[in-house]
């Protein structure tokens, strides 16, 4: 047998590889356009919500995707290195004194914004797809799910805010910090 024939990828693997390359190309093109990406995400979310309202069903799918959105949002708000674990590790023994509490450290997210958007979109598209299949429409009393979702959201966000207050970090930045020069403190004397 010819070994060169076995080493060539099959037709299906070449097809899926070309799809993967095209998908990554379009993701790379969308990366710098944050506002546009989130507008697309909100439009898809409104479409999903309108399907839930018009069909008057698939409440379990909506609840599951809502819990997933909450989990993604919490990962987005959480720092990549948990300060609670840092403070627990400091009890290992005597160390030289340092002043690391006042030191500036940039906020690094556990889930970056692009991955947050990408996971959000995948979950929304999967949820929209689930609404086309009848076996995902499990009969359930939806007010209980709504109440439980709001209680769960309130408790988890309260815990996250308390964590942010305790370890003094802010996960949101408005923009790039700008350097300012010294302010003029006196008059110019012309002599």
From Swiss-Prot:
Which processes are annotated in GO (biological process)?
IRE1-mediated unfolded protein response; protein retention in ER lumen; protein transport; retrograde vesicle-mediated transport, Golgi to endoplasmic reticulum
What InterPro entries does the record point to? Rer1 (IPR004932)
| Membrane topology, from the record | Multi-pass membrane protein
What's a GO cellular component annotated to this UniProt protein?
Answer: endoplasmic reticulum
Compartments where located: Membrane
PANTHER family documented for this protein:
PROTEIN RER1
Function according to Swiss-Prot or TrEMBL? May be involved in protein transport along the secretory pathway.
Record's family? Answer: Belongs to the RER1 family.
Protein name from the UniProt record: Protein RER1 homolog
- The organism encoding this protein is Caenorhabditis elegans
Gene this chain is encoded by? rer-1
């Amino acid at each position: 047998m010819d070994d060169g024939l076995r080493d060539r990828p099959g037709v299906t693997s070449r097809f899926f590889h070309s799809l993967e390359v095209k998908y990554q190309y379009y993701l790379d093109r969308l990366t710098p356009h944050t506002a546009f990406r989130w507008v697309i995400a909100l439009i898809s979310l409104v479409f999903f919500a309108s399907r839930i309202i018009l069909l008057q069903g698939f409440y379990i799918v909506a609840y599951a995707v809502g819990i997933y959105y909450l989990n993604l949002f919490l990962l987005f708000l959480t720092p990549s290195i948990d300060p609670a674990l840092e403070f627990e590790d400091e009890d290992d023994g005597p160390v030289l004194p340092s002043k690391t509490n006042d030191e500036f450290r940039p906020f690094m997210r556990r889930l970056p914004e692009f991955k947050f958007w990408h996971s959000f979109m995948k979950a929304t598209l999967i949820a929209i797809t689930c609404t086309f299949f009848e076996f995902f429409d499990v009969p359930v009393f939806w007010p209980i799910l709504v109440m439980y979702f709001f209680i769960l959201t309130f408790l988890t966000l309260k815990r996250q805010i308390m964590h942010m207050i305790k370890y003094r970090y802010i996960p949101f930045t408005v923009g790039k910090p700008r350097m300012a020069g010294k302010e003029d403190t006196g008059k110019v004397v012309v002599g």
